[in-house]
Amino acid sequence: MTNSKLTETLTFECETGNYHTFCPISCVAWLYQKIEDSFFLVIGTKTCGYFLQNALGVMIFAEPRYAMAELEEADISAQLNDYKELKRLCLQIKQDRNPSVIVWIGTCTTEIIKMDLEGMAPRLEAEIQTPIVVARANGLDYAFTQGEDTVLAAMVQRCPSNAPEQNQIEKKSLVLFGSLPTNVATQLNLELERCGIQVAGWLPSQRYADLPVLNQNVYVCGINPFLSRTATTLMRRRKCKLISAPFPIGPDGTRAWLEKICSVFNVAPINLIERERLIWDSLEDYIALLRGKSVFFMGDNLLEISLARFLVRCGMIVYEIGIPYLDKRFQSAELQLLEKTCSEMNVAMPRIVEKPDNYNQIQRIRELQPDLAITGMAHANPLEARGINTKWSVEFTFAQIHGFTNARDILELVTRPLRRNKALENLGWNQLVKM
């Protein structure tokens, strides 16, 4: 293994570490809220049910639009008929909720016992007259955010190839893919409208009936780094053209994202440089806290490279970017922007470690003593006990971090542990955090 010092070029390493991360079935938490007329049925064991209840904070009276189909010993030993059981559950769901689409989420157990969900779904769909989408968002993936990637890739197959009114199809139309809160998606739509580009649709759409038209005339662009499987499906199955752009995280990433889309559509971007400068000026109070500080990404949700690039632009030094999985083709534009940002800020390039070994990472953190470690929840308390400031990476997944106006939310999350410890020191309580 190379030493932990910084280098002048991006270096890529691959270790064989443990995947201390959430299960991908957690994607249900935000997708059922995004697709308003959907119902998610997770097919798994008691463990999956406990995870959904505890990790997602299910409220008894809220009646969320997802449920657990719990596999028992009789299911696993093939004593029960899977088709009949799933039919009974889906009929009950249709009667109680009447969703426009039912999404079956396969888990590790359905994978291990070779449950033929893809074979049963079309038969049952024809019988109950409700679309059934199958997504194997199991724990065999690299990161929990890839659960959304699996669901969206399955949704691609259900998108129409042609609009009802053919004459309204433009020669080139734009579809954005990735799940965002409605207000953030509206912000990005408005940014593109200011540049003279109309967004034809989003994947996923708020309603199943509003899924976008996908064909060879459609340009698609992702808004999250963990959607490589969806991008591949869009290109191979629906012949869409992928716009390879940095992701709209931070003012710099949002500007680069908009500029790349504008260049593809032969449109001159309007006042983007000035708009980015105004946003940076408004963030100066946070940036002053971060300038010259160091950060270490342990790797958890595949947002690491985009966040690291933004924090470098804020004046931070990034020692290492741990990432559970890196698709260099899908993130090529982001990697180029990271390299360019480090060069412009005159800081050493961080090394990127794919599938990091957590034990080795702890040793490197002990050597480097970063001001902040962005880590999964499993390592946060042990690092805090050793005097390292930490931030849970899962918070960035659920926070609104896309677009110009939400850059402040990213910095609010990043600076919170630094501000907290400074406040404790001012009170004379610094002995509590330095063991």
UniProtKB/Swiss-Prot annotation:
Q: Which cofactor does it need?
A: [4Fe-4S] cluster
Q: What is its main location?
A: plastid
Q: Which Pfam families match?
A: Oxidored_nitro
What InterPro entries would the database entry show? LIPOR_BchN/ChlN, Nase/OxRdtase_comp1, Protochl_reductN
Give one GO molecular function term: ATP binding
Please give the pathway this protein is involved in.
Answer: Porphyrin-containing compound metabolism; chlorophyll biosynthesis (light-independent)
Q: What is the superkingdom listed in this entry's lineage?
A: Eukaryota
Q: Which UniProt keywords apply?
A: 4Fe-4S, ATP-binding, Chlorophyll biosynthesis, Chloroplast, Iron, Iron-sulfur, Metal-binding, Nucleotide-binding, Oxidoreductase, Photosynthesis, Plastid
**Alphabetically, which GO biological process terms does the record hold?**
light-independent chlorophyll biosynthetic process; photosynthesis, dark reaction
User: Does the keyword Oxidoreductase feature in the UniProt annotation?
Assistant: yes
Name its cellular compartments: Plastid, Chloroplast
One CC-aspect GO term: chloroplast
Listed SUPFAM superfamilies: Helical backbone' metal receptor (SSF53807)
Q: How is the cofactor bound?
A: Binds 1 [4Fe-4S] cluster per heterodimer. The cluster is bound at the heterodimer interface by residues from both subunits.
Binding annotation for [4Fe-4S] cluster: 23, 48, 108
Reaction catalysed by this enzyme: chlorophyllide a + oxidized 2[4Fe-4S]-[ferredoxin] + 2 ADP + 2 phosphate = protochlorophyllide a + reduced 2[4Fe-4S]-[ferredoxin] + 2 ATP + 2 H2O
EC numbers on record = 1.3.7.7
UniProt lists the family membership as follows: Belongs to the BchN/ChlN family.
What this protein is reported to do is described as: Component of the dark-operative protochlorophyllide reductase (DPOR) that uses Mg-ATP and reduced ferredoxin to reduce ring D of protochlorophyllide (Pchlide) to form chlorophyllide a (Chlide). This reaction is light-independent. The NB-protein (ChlN-ChlB) is the catalytic component of the complex.
Record-linked PANTHER family: LIGHT-INDEPENDENT PROTOCHLOROPHYLLIDE REDUCTASE SUBUNIT N
Subunit composition?
Answer: Protochlorophyllide reductase is composed of three subunits; ChlL, ChlN and ChlB. Forms a heterotetramer of two ChlB and two ChlN subunits.
* NCBIfam families found in the cross-reference section: DPOR_bchN, PRK02842.1
Q: What is this protein called?
A: Light-independent protochlorophyllide reductase subunit N
Taxonomy-wise, where does this protein's organism fall, top ranks first? Eukaryota, Viridiplantae, Chlorophyta, core chlorophytes, Trebouxiophyceae
